């Protein structure tokens, strides 16, 4: 009769199993499986069952309100930073507002025009405009639009004029060709650029022009 070999006994503790990410069957053996809550929903003739096992097993993560004992311990005085989460609503000042949200103001003839450096800084806040020399030896800003036809060019000029009339600061508008419109801005009373010119340029940038642009051709 052949001798039978016996394997050594295997001692497995519950703690060693839990450290190895136990499966549902192992948790069930040791009575550690949390109750499964199911939510049934009716979708037509079908019943959809959703299990909340993962949520119940992991618990509820996230912030919570402090307990009365924690408030009494004045724990907020022992941490860095501000323990208050009150939000303060501040009124935005002119430095953070868009130029198109500002209003043109009267310009005195004794006021000096903007320097080239200041003009180039403000130029970053408008789209499609460039700085050129004006006839008086100062600076002005210019923008060009390509439109679909002559009627679209006239419509764009009318839209710009309407915005300029509401602001009280008028650009020089030119229909250079049936498909091209040019606008130029500078303050004639000071012979150069003022803040009003860039405010007006930003307001012109907000005008809708997509319906006046040339149609793009699709090549097969």
Curated annotation (Swiss-Prot):
Keywords: Cell membrane, Chloroplast, Lyase, Membrane, Nucleus, Plastid, Tetrahydrobiopterin biosynthesis, Transit peptide, Ubl conjugation. It holds the Pfam family Pterin_4a. Its main location: plastid. Ubiquitinated by SDIR1. Ubiquitination leads to its subsequent degradation, thus controlling abscisic acid (ABA) signaling. Ubiquitinated by AIRP2. Ubiquitination leads to its subsequent degradation, thus controlling abscisic acid (ABA) signaling during drought stress. The keyword Plastid applies. It is found in: Plastid, Chloroplast; Cell membrane; Nucleus. Disulfide bonds: none annotated. It is a peripheral membrane protein. Its EC number is 4.2.1.96. GO terms for cellular component: cell periphery; chloroplast; chloroplast stroma; nucleus; plasma membrane; plastid. CDD domains: PCD_DCoH_subfamily_a. Residues 1-50 form a transit peptide. It catalyses: (4aS,6R)-4a-hydroxy-L-erythro-5,6,7,8-tetrahydrobiopterin = (6R)-L-erythro-6,7-dihydrobiopterin + H2O. GO terms for biological process: response to abscisic acid; response to salt stress; ribulose bisphosphate carboxylase complex assembly; tetrahydrobiopterin biosynthetic process. Involved in tetrahydrobiopterin biosynthesis. Interacts with and acts downstream of the E3 ubiquitin-protein ligase SDIR1 in abscisic acid (ABA) and salt stress signaling. Regulates the expression of the bZIP transcription factor ABI5, which mediates responses to ABA during seed germination and salt stress. The SDIR1-ATP1/SDIRIP1 complex plays an important role in ABA signaling through the ubiquitination pathway. Acts downstream of AIRP2 in regulation of ABA signaling during drought stress. Belongs to the pterin-4-alpha-carbinolamine dehydratase family. Interacts with SDIR1. Interacts with AIRP2. This is Probable pterin-4-alpha-carbinolamine dehydratase, chloroplastic. It comes from Arabidopsis thaliana. The lineage of its organism: Eukaryota, Viridiplantae, Streptophyta, Embryophyta, Tracheophyta.
